[in-house]
């Protein structure tokens, strides 16, 4: 497969595919970016006599390559056996799978792990169980192997420009997420409060999601491509008193004025009276600079400064298995957006289980998913799934088509 893109994302995906691990691979965390890989490809082509790509022309696409999916089910018969087990006794099946998670208090053995009716909508998982999803995604891996697990890379990020990259170990994630957790608390956020997150795909987005989970707040991520009207309607519907955003987002050569959109959204419906604090990650502008392209008000807080003042550890909140973890709104394409509530125990197990069974993700693997955190795929397969299983999640800002040469 000849590669024409210029990003670490593309390089990672090519490496994944050539290793027959669709979106999951065990490669060093400092894997070379695509500019280096392109040189390697060119040298290989020259040695083999195969012509190199014509660099004088733009290439809009690469040749399609289809690979069979990988699964922990090594045969169809083993899959059918597992499926039959889940159908024959769902409660026993999920009770066994719940051992994937670390519980502060084990679910009650006096009640079924799964009870209720999907038809009636009163389904509940793991009664009596107590846990924290952030602890399961970060702390337990950092503490593993006598604390050496904290040296493993938890997240790799590539910015809009391929040269803008960062890595975070599990120890660094624990410290940063704890500081954000304490920053949220300093603004009055408490267990059960809804925090609306309207951010680009920068490291602080999944970190803020995890921070909400850590303190028991309910995160409501709104896709950063939505309008002020769409954002305002979701803030109002969820009764969210807190908003976390960034000054701008980058998408290729475009700058998206996120803070300006938030300011506009707060004039919609009852948002002006509802929202108590807007926390802003400032990436490019000083709030006091004369050329700052947005307005800061008395309720706005400069998040970078606030986070820097916080202690590097926050005790995780003990959550009931049925406590709300997050709300995610439907797109609204078939009517008014509907806020779908995902609860702690059931969702955490779902994210861990499906990431394992579908992608065979193991510790040491790097997992890349091109979804945005504004959608459920991004929640599960960019943030929670890989981290719950102790892998490395790869996230990128902007679009996979940029830069396209």
Residues covered by each model-derived region:
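N-terminal chloroplast transit peptides
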Residues: 1-26
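N-lobe entry segment of adenylate-forming
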Residues: 42-168, 172-175, 179, 270, ...
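Adenylate-forming
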Residues: 86, 138-142, 173, 177, ...
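Conserved AMP-binding/adenylate-forming core of the ANL superfamily
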Residues: 134, 151-210, 227-232, 299-308, ...
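Conserved pre-ATP/AMP-binding loop-to-beta segment of ANL
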Residues: 151-153, 275-286, 294-329, 336, ...
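A short helix-loop-beta submotif of the ANL/AMP-binding
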Residues: 181-182, 187, 194, 200-228, ...
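Structural core segment of the AMP-binding/adenylate-forming
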Residues: 210, 214-305
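Conserved AMP-binding/adenylation subdomain of ANL enzymes
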Residues: 346-366, 376-405
